Design a protein with these regions (language model features):
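Conserved catalytic scaffold of divalent metal-dependent phosphoesterases
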Residues: 10-12, 78-179, 222-223
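Alpha/beta-hydrolase fold active-site loops
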Residues: 2, 32, 106-108, 157-159, ...
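N-terminal active-site segment of His-dependent metallophosphoesterases
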Residues: 1-62, 72-79, 131, 135, ...
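Active-site neighborhood of phospho(di)ester-bond hydrolases with catalytic His/Asp-centered motifs
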Residues: 6-8, 34-39, 63-69, 90-95, ...
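Short hydrophobic patches on amphipathic alpha-helices
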Residues: 27-28, 56, 84, 149, ...
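Short, well-ordered alpha-helix to beta-strand connector turns
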Residues: 31, 60, 88, 155-156, ...
Length: 254
């Protein structure tokens, strides 16, 4: 059994240092892998990332993360990456990585994702250059997911880690007028094509916990949605089947 601890939208700052450190300390002995689905900081300052880094230094399990929109706000993502790396956190930006957990290879494809919308409210590849640039950015994110999933096809467990949502299901509860800015269905296309066992994202604070891409489970692990610091998902490493039938999740909070 592989225990994955997942969280998004921690929005760390010096004011939340004690809470964040306590949340990570509580993971000791409870998780085999930690996945952070973006918005680690309040406004993208390296000093805020240091709060996360300090908390992570107490853990001896693999930690993978992607950045979110908040983490990009101050245009200091290179510094944030350095801070996180100093604590052993592997930041994934259109990349993939893997780790060994009890003899099973766990592959993680990580990227921020981007906006674009869903059927009925999707941005087109048409019009002003700025609009087409947005479309191209989402294309690049989707292409990175495709490359990553092909690269980890040999892994026993395959996880996609995003910030923006690839499905409409987990946006239920958010105002429909902002769905376009919460994710894009185009992020789901390579996942449906190449397969995964689990997809995680955040960003949608007022969204819903659970969705799917075909038979592949998708979870919005924003702390505002889960109602806790981390959500623990258990994957049966003895026989993980594509489509995630053996992903066990406790009942989400009402």
């Amino acid at each position: 059994m592989i225990r994955v601890a997942a969280a998004a939208d921690i929005h760390a700052s010096d004011a939340s240092r004690e809470r964040v450190e306590r949340a990570f300390a509580d993971l000791e002995g409870a998780a085999d892998v930690v996945l952070l689905a973006g918005d680690l900081t309040t406004s993208g300052e390296p000093e805020q990332a240091e709060v996360i880094a300090t908390a992570c230094r107490g853990l001896d399990v693999p930690i993978f993360a992607v950045l979110g929109n908040h983490d990009h706000h101050s245009d200091r993502t290179d510094e944030i990456e350095e801070v996180l790396a100093s604590a052993g956190v592997r930041l994934l930006d259109r990349e993939c990585a893997s780790c060994d957990v009890d003899g099973l290879e766990v592959g993680v494809v990580g990227t921020k994702g981007f906006i674009g919308g869903f059927p009925g409210s999707a941005l087109p590849d048409f019009g002003e250059p700025l609009l087409r640039h947005v479309y191209a950015e989402t294309t690049a994110e989707a292409d990175a997911i495709a490359r990553g999933l092909q690269a980890i096809v040999h892994c026993d467990v395959r996880i996609v880690l995003l910030h923006y949502s690839p499905v409409l299901d987990t946006l239920e509860g958010e105002p429909p007028g902002i769905h376009t800015y919460l994710g894009s269905e185009r992020l789901a296309t390579p996942i449906a094509e190449y397969g995964a066992d689990l997809v995680l994202h955040g960003h949608a604070h007022a969204g819903s916990f659970e969705g799917c891409i075909g038979d592949i489970p998708v979870y919005n692990v924003a702390v505002h949605v889960t109602g806790r610091n981390f959500w623990i998902l258990e994957l049966d490493g003895g026989g993980v089947r594509r489509g995630g039938e053996v992903v066990e999740v406790h009942e989400p909070p009402q």
